[in-house]
């Protein structure tokens, strides 16, 4: 027993396939996964956002604008949608992903360490509470309801047409 003065020399060696991959992306080589054909919405969570120019702006056959106006409007719509989306994701995607990660981690921790133990404790205590509640019901509420029922059973009403 005493003060240790030696430095510990610890190194961790892991093969690339030794740890669990929770996502498809291999973070050791992200350039390998810059495939634009990859489906980033496999569960179709945002299928309602797949709108095009024709879904938003439509001219009936009787009223058409000039062809050049239609083509320029379509091009400007697509370019602005692309540029603004890229611009917003550059500034918002990482902070919002960080906030969402913190939020989900906090909710998971609260659920695992506070909510479920509380629910299990309540379910464990419930049989004795159920016995006490049945006794209170039999002793207090049962006779009270019986008395009120007998009082109202002796009431009679007669309707007469005048």
Swiss-Prot record:
Subcellular localization, per the record? Nucleus; Cytoplasm; Golgi apparatus membrane; Cell membrane
Keywords in alphabetical order, please: Cell membrane, Cytoplasm, Golgi apparatus, Membrane, Nucleus, Phosphoprotein
Q: Which residues lie on this side of the membrane: Cytoplasmic?
A: 1-86, 108-162
In-chain residues carrying the UniProt-annotated modification Phosphotyrosine: 19, 27
Q: Output the GO biological process annotations, alphabetical, semicolon-separated.
A: basement membrane organization; caveola assembly; cell differentiation; cell population proliferation; chemical synaptic transmission; endoplasmic reticulum organization; endothelial cell proliferation; insulin receptor signaling pathway
* Record has Ribosomal protein as a keyword: no
How does it sit in the bilayer? Peripheral membrane protein
On modification after translation, the UniProt record reads: Phosphorylated on serine and tyrosine residues. CAV1 promotes phosphorylation on Ser-23 which targets the complex to the plasma membrane, lipid rafts and caveolae. Phosphorylation on Ser-36 appears to modulate mitosis in endothelial cells. Phosphorylation on both Tyr-19 and Tyr-27 is required for insulin-induced 'Ser-727' phosphorylation of STAT3 and its activation. Phosphorylation on Tyr-19 is required for insulin-induced phosphorylation of MAPK1 and DNA binding of STAT3. Tyrosine phosphorylation is induced by both EGF and insulin.
Provide the effect of residue 27 to A.
Abolishes phosphorylation and insulin-induced nuclear location, but no effect on insulin-induced 'S-727' phosphorylation of STAT3 nor on MAPK1 phosphorylation
Q: Which GO terms describe its molecular function?
A: D1 dopamine receptor binding; mitogen-activated protein kinase kinase kinase binding; molecular adaptor activity; phosphoprotein binding; protein heterodimerization activity; protein homodimerization activity; protein kinase binding; protein-macromolecule adaptor activity
- What is the superkingdom listed in this entry's lineage? Eukaryota
Q: Which InterPro entries match?
A: Caveolin, Caveolin_CS
Tissues expressing the protein: In the retina, mainly expressed in vessels, but also diffuse expression in the inner and outer plexiform layers and in the inner nuclear layer.
Per the record, residues carrying Phosphoserine are: 20, 23, 36
Sequence ranges marked intramembrane in UniProt: 87-107
**Which GO CC terms are listed, alphabetically?**
acrosomal membrane; caveola; caveolar macromolecular signaling complex; cell surface; cytoplasmic vesicle; focal adhesion; Golgi apparatus; Golgi membrane
Quaternary structure note: Monomer or homodimer. Interacts with CAV1; the interaction forms a stable heterooligomeric complex that is required for targeting to lipid rafts and for caveolae formation. Tyrosine phosphorylated forms do not form heterooligomers with the Tyr-19-phosphorylated form existing as a monomer or dimer and the Tyr-27-form as a monomer only. Interacts (tyrosine phosphorylated form) with the SH2 domain-containing proteins, RASA1, NCK1 and SRC. Interacts (tyrosine phosphorylated form) with INSR; the interaction (Tyr-27-phosphorylated form) is increased on insulin stimulation.
Main function: May act as a scaffolding protein within caveolar membranes. Interacts directly with G-protein alpha subunits and can functionally regulate their activity. Acts as an accessory protein in conjunction with CAV1 in targeting to lipid rafts and driving caveolae formation. The Ser-36 phosphorylated form has a role in modulating mitosis in endothelial cells. Positive regulator of cellular mitogenesis of the MAPK signaling pathway. Required for the insulin-stimulated nuclear translocation and activation of MAPK1 and STAT3, and the subsequent regulation of cell cycle progression.
Q: Which family does it belong to?
A: Belongs to the caveolin family.
Protein name, please? Caveolin-2
Lineage, please?
Answer: Eukaryota, Metazoa, Chordata, Craniata, Vertebrata
């Amino acid at each position: 027993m005493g003060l240790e003065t030696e430095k510990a020399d610890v190194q961790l060696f892991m093969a690339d396939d030794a740890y669990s991959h929770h996502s498809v992306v291999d973070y050791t080589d992200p350039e390998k996964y810059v495939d634009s054909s990859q489906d980033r919405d496999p569960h179709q969570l945002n299928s309602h956002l797949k709108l095009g120019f024709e879904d938003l702006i439509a001219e009936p056959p009787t009223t058409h604008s000039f062809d050049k106006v239609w083509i320029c409007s379509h091009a400007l719509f697509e370019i602005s949608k692309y540029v603004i989306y890229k611009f917003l994701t550059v500034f918002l995607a990482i902070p919002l992903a960080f906030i969402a990660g913190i939020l989900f981690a906090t909710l998971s921790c609260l659920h695992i360490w506070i909510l479920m133990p509380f629910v299990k404790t309540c379910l464990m205590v419930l049989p004795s509470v159920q016995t006490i509640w049945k006794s209170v019901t039999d002793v207090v509420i049962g006779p009270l309801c019986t008395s009120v029922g007998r009082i109202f059973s002796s009431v009679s009403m007669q309707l007469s047409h005048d």
